[in-house]
């Protein structure tokens, strides 16, 4: 019997409205390709991180035409960013719809390695927090796309630049908030987002650099706003200036822009300003002098890298090199950079240090244990082939348990908590074993759960050898084994069969009080996991079975026992040979000469000799298929039924 669960999550459609069936069907096709629910959560979390990196690209859309002294926009960047943003938002909308009609009822466990899902829209809608739903909706609203595609081409586009900045900021915060539940789900299922310590450190460093890039993008757009403010202030100081906000657009700009704006806003460092009429650009002077505001659309990588470097440099320096003007907004922006740099740097160092320590603690323990094992093997002069097998087993056990001693951990728990934990880990698997499925008493199964112990075997390992005593009964949960016999068991040499999930090795422990001798050799073909029951555990189970359960266990034992199957095959073959023998004897009787025939003595002797010779030839021709009594193999002895010892007082 196979104990492995279904590859995909189980979907229960009870209680779902008919209108949701089509949506659910499409979602099942999308999610059907995912290995587990946890992998899907990781994918959605990665999409959220990518969305955080895409949104600041909207701030790089405005440009300054240095030849005509007017504002323009990067149309190529508009198309690319809108397409990517729409694709990611659509992906997340599918995720929102899916979780609105699904509810996770069984988180990932170390025993099952699976998550189960039940489709139940009403239950989920009642339990889902309204706050998270509102945050999800605000996060995926296509407001930036609407602004850059509709408002910017209009005449009031300079006003829409400030609107765009606040829209990006208002959606950026909900996008960060919506990542927290996903992050908690992933860490609860996997223990960490990244399994490798270097991947975890790189992830924390990436998040630190992401904030640097975000601050650089806001600095870029604020520099353009500062330039626009300077031109408008210069026009306000001149009586003959009649430029309006719309005249600063390149599609409406004329020759007056070039003549007036060419000398209206000189780029002077804040420390060198001596005249009060000179405009103070503050910390945005670097963006204006570097020319990143005036580059052509095809030079976008240059603009992006420079703004990223500015943000990384000032966050790392906590904003100490920033020289601001007396503008309140600029000073507030500098304060945010300083405080954010301090917090981000502290979080980065703390997370990296914590992640490396948590990841290396068990690795160090494994290395220390490996060194002790090597010293012991060298001290005891263990042969090289045994050393290699020991090393491979230690590595395999580490991969499966991550250094956690499961049995020691379970023994340290209180009795009620230990029983509940073991019942959750083992009960479903034990119920699928035919030998244990006959137990109707729930407490007896729970007692068996408390007694089983998990074991691991490498490939090509011997579970038990022929002629050796059987000391434990193995219940296979994963892997394949081969059971062979070198003796003439049941009249056949090298009798072989395969064992897999749900099969049992060592069922002879049910017979008698002494340890039985194994009649077969069991060897693993692949890496095998399972549970073992010791002889005392078998006696405990047998002593608590009633008469009907014992009879049912005997029938189940006959059905699944290899000895009983082999004996049944030989018994059927012997019965068939006996049937063929009787049929042949009847044919011979029909060929005899009828009595009462009048023949003389010579003819009688001649006929008798002829019939005797013909019968001898007939026996010789049919010897291979008729199975004569002398050539027929003996029927093996019937295997013994299970013997149950009486319960000890």
Curated annotation (Swiss-Prot):
Membrane-side (Extracellular) residue stretches: 65-76, 150-162, 222-329
InterPro entries the UniProt entry points to: cNMP-bd_dom, cNMP-bd_dom_sf, Ion_trans_dom, RmlC-like_jellyroll
Region listing for Calmodulin-binding, in residue ranges: 545-560
Residues covered by the IQ domain: 565-594
Keywords annotated in UniProt: Calmodulin-binding, cAMP, cAMP-binding, Cell membrane, cGMP, cGMP-binding, Ion channel, Ion transport, Ligand-gated ion channel, Membrane, Nucleotide-binding, Transmembrane, Transmembrane helix, Transport
Membrane spanning stretches: 44-64, 77-97, 129-149, 163-183, 201-221, 330-350
CC annotations in GO: plasma membrane
Source superkingdom: Eukaryota
Ranges annotated as biased composition (Basic and acidic residues): 638-649
Binding site residues for a nucleoside 3',5'-cyclic phosphate: 436-559
Subcellular location per the Swiss-Prot or TrEMBL entry: Cell membrane
Segments of this protein annotated with the region Disordered: 618-649
Gene Ontology terms: biological process: defense response; response to bacterium; response to fungus
The family this protein is said to belong to: Belongs to the cyclic nucleotide-gated cation channel (TC 1.A.1.5) family.
Note on domains (UniProt): The binding of calmodulin to the C-terminus might interfere with cyclic nucleotide binding and thus channel activation.
The protein's name in its UniProt record: Probable cyclic nucleotide-gated ion channel 12
Species the sequence originates in: Arabidopsis thaliana
Gene expressing this chain: CNGC12
């Amino acid at each position: 019997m196979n104990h492995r669960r279904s590859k995909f999550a189980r979907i229960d459609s009870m209680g779902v409205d008919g209108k949701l069936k089509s949506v659910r069907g499409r979602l099942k096709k999308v999610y059907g390709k995912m290995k587990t629910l946890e992998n899907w959560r990781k994918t959605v979390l990665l999409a959220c991180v990518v969305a955080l990196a895409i949104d600041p690209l909207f701030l790089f859309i405005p440009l300054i035409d240095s030849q005509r002294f007017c504002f323009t926009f990067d149309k190529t960047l508009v198309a690319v960013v809108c397409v990517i943003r729409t694709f990611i938002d659509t992906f997340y909308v599918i995720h929102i719809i899916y979780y609105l009609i699904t509810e996770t009822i069984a988180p990932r466990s170390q025993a099952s390695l699976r998550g189960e899902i039940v489709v139940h829209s009403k239950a989920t809608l009642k339990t889902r927090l309204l706050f998270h739903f509102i945050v999800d909706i605000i996060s995926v609203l296509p407001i930036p796309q609407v602004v850059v595609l509709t408002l910017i081409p209009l005449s009031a586009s300079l006003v829409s630049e400030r609107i765009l900045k606040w829209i990006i900021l208002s959606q950026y915060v909900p996008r960060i908030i919506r990542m927290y539940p996903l992050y908690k789900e992933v860490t609860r299922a996997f223990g960490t987002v990244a399994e490798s310590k270097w991947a975890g450190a790189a992830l924390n460093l990436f998040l630190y650099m992401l904030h640097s890039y975000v601050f650089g993008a806001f600095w870029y757009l604020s520099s353009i706003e500062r330039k626009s403010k300077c031109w408008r202030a210069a026009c306000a100081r001149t009586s003959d200036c009649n430029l309006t906000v719309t005249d600063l657009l390149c599609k409406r700009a004329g020759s007056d822009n070039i003549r007036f704006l060419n000398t209206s806003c000189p780029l002077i460092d804040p420390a060198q300003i001596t005249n009060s009429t000179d405009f103070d650009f503050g910390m945005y002077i670097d963006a204006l002098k570097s020319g990143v505001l005036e580059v052509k659309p095809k030079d976008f990588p240059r603009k992006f890298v420079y703004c990223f470097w500015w943000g990384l440099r000032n966050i790392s320096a906590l904003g100490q090199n920033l020289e601001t003007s007396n503008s309140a907004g600029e000073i507030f922006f500098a304060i945010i950079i300083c405080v954010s740099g301090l917090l981000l740097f502290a979080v980065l160092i703390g997370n990296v240090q914590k992640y490396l320590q948590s990841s290396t603690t068990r690795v160090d323990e494994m290395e220390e244990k490996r060194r002790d094992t090597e010293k012991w093997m060298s001290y005891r002069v263990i042969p090289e082939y045994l050393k290699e097998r020991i090393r491979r087993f230690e590595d395999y056990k580490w991969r499966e348990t991550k250094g956690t001693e499961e049995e020691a951990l379970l023994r340290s728990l209180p009795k009620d908590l230990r029983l509940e934990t073991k019942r959750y880990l083992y009960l479903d698997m034990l119920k699928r074993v035919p030998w244990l499925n006959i137990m109707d008493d729930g407490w007896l199964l729970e007692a068996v759960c408390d007694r089983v112990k998990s074991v691991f075997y490498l490939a090509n390992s011997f579970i038990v050898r022929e002629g050796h005593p059987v000391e434990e009964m193995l219940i296979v949960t994963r892997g394949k084994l081969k059971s062979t016999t070198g003796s003439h068991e049941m009249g056949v040499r090298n009798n072989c069969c395969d064992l897999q999930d749900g099969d049992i090795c060592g069922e002879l422990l049910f017979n008698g009080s002494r340890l039985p001798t194994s009649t077969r050799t069991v060897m693993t073909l692949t890496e095998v996991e399972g549970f073992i029951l010791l002889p005392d555990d078998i006696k405990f189970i047998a002593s608590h079975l009633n008469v009907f359960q014992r009879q049912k266990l005997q029938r189940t034992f006959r059905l699944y026992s290899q000895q009983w199957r082999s004996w049944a095959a030989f018994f059927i073959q012997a019965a068939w040979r006996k049937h063929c023998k009787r049929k042949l004897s009847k044919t011979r009787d029909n060929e005899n000469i009828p009595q009462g025939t009048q023949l003389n003595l010579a003819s009688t002797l001649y006929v008798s000799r002829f019939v005797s010779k013909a019968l001898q030839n007939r026996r010789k021709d049919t010897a291979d298929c008729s199975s004569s009594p002398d050539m027929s193999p003996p029927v093996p002895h019937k295997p013994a039924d299970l013997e149950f010892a009486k319960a000890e007082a």
